[in-house]
Amino acid sequence: MSERIPIEILEGYRESFNKQEGRKYPCSNQTVVCGIFTDSRNKAIDFMEDKDIIDIRVMHNEIVWRLRNGEKWIWTNWNESHRGYRFYKVAVDKDVDRKLFENMILVYTSFYCCSFEII
């Protein structure tokens, strides 16, 4: 990760997003999921450790968890295109890259996200 966002700014976004009602269902053809934004596969796995997981799919550059409550959490290489996703809940690495945050996380969480965690 290159230029990082100061933790105070991330905390401000967390406060703002956690006040939103969020939108669990899309208004078009997008898929609404939950995303884990970190370069560390192990950090993503640790974050999901205490969740009520019913299914895990591990592929080369992606892990998908399905939870008993119906949520679908994804960890992947976020530097690739993910245009169809909108994020209802996110877990963001405290060392997240500024460019990734501004060009991916903010764009795909606006109006949908109601839970923003810093990991």
List PLM regions with ranges:
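Short, flexible loop motifs at catalytic/binding sites
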Residues: 1-119
